[in-house]
Amino acid sequence: ETQEIKAAQTSIRENLGLSFQAAADLSLEFARTAAATGQSAEELGKSLSIMESMSGASREVLLNQIRSNAAMIEAAGVAPAQVMKDIASNTEFFAEFARDGGQNLIQAGVAAAKLGLSMDQVKSTTESLLSFEESIEKQMEASLLLGRQINLDRARQLALTGDQAGMMEEVLRQVGGEAEFAQMTYLQRKALADSVGSTVENLSRMVRNRSASATAGTLAESGDAAHETQKSMLEATNDIAKYT
């Protein structure tokens, strides 16, 4: 436990810029949160730093929110450490697209994990779709090769507004089912993957895992339920923050 406390103090000073005494005061709560979420002290320090930049809540309240998020992720059937570490390694993406204290990207992280993806791959798809001219050109190429219309306008809109979970669902809707994907030629699969900023391997995994685990609608419903619960928890956290 002493090592965990020392690691917590180091991360707090490096990531939050606190004095030695302030870091010591926060270190026990910090170490407990790291253990509860499966994050290293360094990862948690990054997560807390980016959340602090978007919230007026105290650090203690934010640490409690992080633990609550971890509990919700686990309730959704995903390992909290997997999603938390993913977010900690994509702090710039988190800062750019986070809404509601980052709940939208936590929801996206859960959806991505269920599809066998990481936040790196969600980021890649987001950036590809938002490179509008290139994205539209690739969409047209994929449509030509597939012999059917691919329309990623909705996916682009969702990406732009920070709904990455919805974006992935829309991408899968455009791709089609597992049987349809299996019948495509290499060039068709490659063009389709390119149009959404993915690889054939990752797109295949998405289609396979979506088909194996649930329908797209079921995934969306579970994501929406998690989001509503997280929203309620965020509102409670904000209420607490008013009195701290």
Report residues per predicted region.
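Amphipathic alpha-helical assembly segments
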Residues: 3-244
